Each structure stands twice: as C-alpha cells, then as structure tokens.
Amino acid sequence: MNDLIVTVDLDWACEPAIEDTLNFLKNHNISPTVFVTHRSSIVEAALNEIEVALHPYFAPDSSHGSTIVEVVNYIMELPHNLSGFRCHRFANCNLSRHAMVEAGMLISSNICTDMEVIPPFKDRFGLLEVPIFLEDGGYLWRKHPLEISKKLESILLGAGQKVIVIHPMHFSVNTPYFGYMYNIKESVGGRANWKNMSSQTLNNLRWHGRGIRNLLVELLQIVPHKSSLGDLYRSVLK
C-alpha cells in the first residue's frame, strides 16, 4: 500500500494561515488530520469534514498548564473528533503518555523521522504509534533541498504509508529556511500576537521566492492516494 497521510499541526497559528492551509487542501480534495493547540473557528466549522485530534504541550512554559494533569484537562476540552494526539515539540514521556491513554486516546504520532518509512506499531500503553515521514520544520532544519529530489520521489512512490506534517504558518508564509520563521517568531512579540496576526501582516511576511510551500504542493501531487490517521487506525483494527 502506498498512502500519503496529510496532517496539520496548528501550533497556535493565526486564523488567516489556518484558513489558507485548509482551503488549499480542500480545493485539492485532501482531507487532513488536524492537531489542535487552541480554539480555531476555522477548524471547528470543518469538524464534520475533517479529522481533528489534539496537540498538547507538556512543558513548564506551556499555555496549556504547568503540570501533566493541567495540560491534559485543558487539551481535552478542545473540540475534537479523533482520539489521537501529537505533542508539541514531541515532548512526551511515560507519565504524559499514560495520562493521555487514561483520557481516552488511542492514536499517538510522536516519532518524527527524516524521510524514513516506518510502519505503525503498538507501544507499551496500547497506543497505535504512527511515525512521521516528513515534517516541514524538520525538513527545513535539516537543510534539505526545496526541490523534489530523485531520492525523495522514489521513496514517495515506493511502498508504505507516509505521514507528513504541515504547519499553517510555514505553509502560508512559504518559509525558505528554518531561521526565517524563527526570526518572525522573535519579532512579533509573543504567542498572543502570533496567534492574532492579521491577513495583512501575514501577507507582508510571505516569502515570494521558492519555499517550503512550493515543495509541499509538488509533493502532494506525486502520491495520488491520500488517507487519514483515522482510516489507518480502522485498517489496523480489521
């Protein structure tokens, strides 16, 4: 089987970036699994059309809470329709994973590879762990080319399910290199300004040369069959 599973990590993105990303995917008949960090009217309006899972942040500086219990309580209140989670910065441990299982989670996607195809597996808590094939930020951090290489195309066309991660801010801004987005985050003055960024500000920050959006758009065209985390989970249960 050769499926591409498209996932979107909100990471406190502003509504214009979320709308831009989800509209693009919808217009190309791609139904993503969205991992939410916060309330989004755009995502919530699409709850009947797309899968929505959770994106908790387990860290002392988390806006979700300062303890595992606080983070779990906060994140479980966010509207969602899939019992799955992916931790922000992949920051999880035995205690946090156990807490998410106790809260009803069935799917985890917290192993991020550098373009490796690894099949899903059950972990010690009974979660179905679904490894990530490619994450946009990690791809930029590794300084991979912004063109589809022959090697990447060969892997994409080969056997196995590949999970990719798109961040709305990376996609909408068309980030050309890792430091570009880092500098934006430093300049906007806090998470509140980041989350409430206007369309005009977002447009002013957009990179007009070749960037990660260009690569992702081409990547999505290479693999014709798209699936979702929910579809994958149901296929494993059969």
Feature annotation, model-predicted:
Residues 1-49, 73, 77-81, 94-106, ...:
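Terminal accessory/targeting
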Residues 2-9, 53-66:
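Glycine-rich phosphate-binding "P-loop"
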Residues 45, 64-70:
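Core nucleotidyl-transferase/polymerase catalytic module
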